[in-house]
């Protein structure tokens, strides 16, 4: 994610793709309330632009967030200044005792970190187990096979007031790999006048089989 989520893509992701983070925050706050941890610390892996972290802070939870994208962390620090937000791979994240560890938005499936495809996730899950307080929660989602139906690749277009994004998705069922090629368009100020730029993020891949199997 350090390459794929540069300044423009981080801006667009924050502006137009925050619904999942907001919904997840509502769910996690309720789960922690039911678990008797209404003020418990939350460690958010792949914290993105801080939408989730801000909602947890507003609900009274201390938050530590990790993200490998400097652009995402910069946005998150503006949105959630009360959170402890750290730049780096979640595979190396410090995990203090906590009520919950979260990894929302399929971040455990991304292959930007080489360790995700190897034994890195096994070690991470073991450390999460050690960090969670009794009754603590691990909340995450992963990419599932079959995302692309019909002819591959598939293209989609989405736009907002000052941005647009073109996404091309290709799935290799044999290799269990999903690849996204993303082109962003964003209106930006230039010398006091309106301007625009287009950027193509490096293709990002995720592995639907990345999360360790647990019986």
Model-derived segments and their meaning:
Residues 139-214:
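SAM-dependent methyltransferase
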Residues 99-119:
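A short SAM/SAH-binding and catalytic strip from SAM-dependent methyltransferases
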Residues 40:
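Nucleotide donor/acceptor-binding cores
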Residues 22, 70, 118-122:
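Non-membrane alpha-helical structural segments and their capping/turn regions in soluble enzymes
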Residues 43, 49-93:
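Class I SAM-dependent methyltransferase SAM/SAH-binding core
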Residues 119-134:
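A short glycine-rich, Lys/Arg-flanked "PGG" loop and its adjoining helix->strand segment in the class I
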Residues 93, 109-111, 147:
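Short glycine-rich, flexible loops that bind phosphorylated cofactors or substrates
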Residues 1-37, 51:
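Conserved class I S-adenosyl-L-methionine
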